[in-house]
Amino acid sequence: MKEILYLIIYLSFVFSYSQKRIYELEKQIAIPFVEIYSDAGDLIDVTNEQGYINQNFEAKINSLSTRNVIFVHPFFEIKQISIEEYFNSKIINLKRNVIELKEVIISNKRGVKYLKLKGYFRSVQMNENKPHYFNDGIVNYYISLKTGKIKSKVLYNRSFEDKSLKQLSGLYHFSIVGVPLFNDLLTHKNIINKYSFNKESDKSKSILFDNKTKGYLNTNNDNLELQLSINSKEDSKKMKLLGMESELDLYNISAIYDSNDKIDFDLTNLIFFKEIRGYNLRKNKKQKFSRIEATHEFFLLEKEYLEDIDDNKFNINYSFIFPSSYDSPFWVEIGNKLYQPYPTSLLNSIQLMKEIK
């Protein structure tokens, strides 16, 4: 019996360490939440909190017959390598983006009621790994300084859909593409109510829940970086509504703040936000689960304090916005140095979609 137990422990050890891991090139620190795409634009995988690639990743890339894999993370340069190079590499290194951000000048805060954040958003939804919907545009967020409630108003947008992709049935459509809502955990005040912290170094803290690492707070070039896993396969969220069964087993958020203080961060100094969600869905128990994933990003362009809000019509968050509405190509030049274009494979897939005008 002891021999069997030792064998199980040994095999578990070997199997866990056979997983590839993604590291920061200069510091050899593991990178969580790296998205991995095929050369056809399919989202194949997302690394976990410790930077490990999932154990079934190699089976996935073999089934897709991709020649290359592309690694995407908002804090690092996009990297593409061949399948041969991937299999011959023990670890994958990504190079950090070196970015000097300009200070955002804001108006006097006396007597104001709202904070307005104007920025560029983009959102893509995957159906069984393939791009299905795409929205991007310019949006104003209005945040009440008294209640914290947030309203959003889209000024311009583009809308694309791949109509060849089918969802659960002709009657059921699951869509979370569109303007994202800022998560409550983007503020220090809220995050400390649920999580604890452990100091890793002078520039890094790990974020813990039930003594398990769920993310990190890092300072870098006078900015603060937040990375947090809210839901994963180990702590998924299951829901049922109108006969629909869903499981949220991937929900990660990342953010950058104009602050190097690990205590002083909230929406007033937010300059970048990203989230990725993954759902398993089915209409009834006889069906197989369908896989839906969506990424949302927001890049701050302007910040202003207001006494009142002029707009009176607002958008619903996580709702596909159509048709396209714009006077000029707002997407050509984004005035936020954190902005990186999508990998070419994903851009090509979006360009093959039909724009809804």
What do these predicted ranges mean?
Residues 34-46, 106-110:
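Short amphipathic beta-strand segments in non-cytosolic proteins
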Residues 68-81:
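A short, solvent-exposed loop/turn motif at the edges and junctions
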Residues 1-22:
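Bacterial Sec-dependent N-terminal signal peptides
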